[in-house]
């Protein structure tokens, strides 16, 4: 599938180490390194990143950006240290919403909102927000959520995720001003044509 993405002109791939997210450690480093090498894509990876050793392993494997979720809630001091060491372009904060931030592979709900968490990160540049309430439904993205985030957080590049079921959803998110959109199930189930998606991407 990655070869197909690359053949159509894709440049970025978002990956989640689901085993790592549940285990609380990066669990699939060999597979990730192999995919980076064979695909030729810029790959960002999340799931189970808890230590500086995890981060070092991923960057040594060729990963371009890491996606930090649970730890950005539980240990802002460490994550802010990563911003200083690796730079804002290398880190995406993952703030998943329903309506409070969920952590540990969405198994635990914190007492914090997206805005509570992001207040701790003055160096942040990229924020991924999945609305868990619509994730996997293919019924449309949460436009009101992202509109509110863009208004409150104009300094950040917002990446939307969850609910995207058609190319029209992506047009709507683009019109709002989000920086990027994670699309997965809609491609695999044929709701969005890969060539059409990448043609849109090349125009924007």
Q: How would you describe each model-predicted region?
A:
Residues 5, 13, 58, 93, ...:
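Conserved, mostly hydrophobic/aromatic
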Residues 31-34, 111-159:
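Active-site/ligand-binding-proximal alpha/beta "capping" segment
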Residues 31, 36-39, 43-66, 144-183:
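Catalytic cores of alpha/beta
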Residues 12-30, 130-138:
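Glycine-rich, proline-tolerant flexible connector loops at the mouths of alpha/beta enzymes
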Residues 1-6, 51-56, 108-120:
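Short, acidic/polar
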Residues 77-86, 91, 171-176, 180-204:
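C-terminal helical cap(s) of enzyme catalytic domains, especially alpha/beta-barrels
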Residues 63-135:
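Conserved anion-binding
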Residues 14-17, 44, 67-68, 92, ...:
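Conserved beta-strand positions in the central sheet of alpha/beta enzyme cores
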């Amino acid at each position: 599938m990655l070869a197909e993405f690359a053949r159509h002109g894709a440049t970025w791939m978002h990956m989640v180490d689901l085993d790592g997210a549940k285990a609380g450690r990066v669990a699939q480093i060999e597979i990730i390194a192999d995919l980076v090498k064979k695909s030729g894509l810029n790959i960002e990876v999340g799931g189970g990143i808890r230590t500086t050793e995890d981060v070092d392993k991923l960057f040594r494997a060729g990963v371009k950006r890491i996606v930090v979720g649970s730890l950005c809630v539980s240990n802002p001091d460490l994550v802010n240290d990563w911003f200083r060491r690796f730079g804002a372009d290398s880190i995406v904060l993952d703030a998943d919403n329903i309506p409070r931030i969920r952590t540990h592979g969405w198994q635990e709900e914190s007492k914090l909102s997206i805005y509570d968490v992001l207040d701790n990160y003055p160096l942040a540049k990229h924020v991924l927000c999945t609305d868990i309430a619509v994730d996997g439904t293919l019924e449309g993205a949460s436009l009101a959520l992202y509109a509110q985030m863009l208004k409150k957080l104009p300094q950040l590049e917002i990446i939307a995720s969850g609910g995207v079921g058609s190319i029209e959803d992506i047009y709507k998110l683009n019109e709002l001003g989000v920086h990027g959109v994670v699309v997965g199930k809609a491609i695999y189930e044929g709701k969005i044509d890969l060539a059409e998606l990448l043609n849109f991407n090349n125009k924007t």
